[in-house]
């Protein structure tokens, strides 16, 4: 198997986190599915909070969900 099937909810969370860290609006959520949107928004909130706390670049690498998984 070349690559495992990834969890859609985890991917939505990670994409939301990245959007929050880069300062994108929460209205940029690409999903219309309520469950995926919920995970995306959770990631966005976490990323936005980390951005406001100054955890960007090297100082925030321990919080990056892609590094943890």
Curated annotation (Swiss-Prot):
Compartmental location: Cytoplasm
GO biological process: one example: regulation of translation
One GO location term (cellular component): cytoplasm
Iron in keyword set: no
Main location: cytoplasm
Domain of life: Bacteria
Keywords: Cytoplasm, Translation regulation
InterPro entries listed in its UniProt record: Ribosome_modulation_factor, RMF_sf
Function, in words: During stationary phase, converts 70S ribosomes to an inactive dimeric form (100S ribosomes).
Protein family (similarity comment): Belongs to the ribosome modulation factor family.
Name assigned to this protein: Ribosome modulation factor
Organism name: Chromohalobacter salexigens (strain ATCC BAA-138 / DSM 3043 / CIP 106854 / NCIMB 13768 / 1H11)
Gene: rmf
């Amino acid at each position: 198997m070349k690559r495992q099937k990834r969890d859609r909810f985890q991917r939505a969370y990670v994409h939301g986190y990245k959007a929050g860290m880069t300062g994108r609006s929460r209205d940029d959520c690409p999903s219309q599915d309520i469950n995926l949107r919920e995970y995306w928004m959770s990631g966005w909130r976490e990323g936005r909070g980390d951005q406001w706390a100054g955890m960007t670049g090297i100082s925030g690498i321990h919080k990056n969900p892609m590094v943890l998984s």
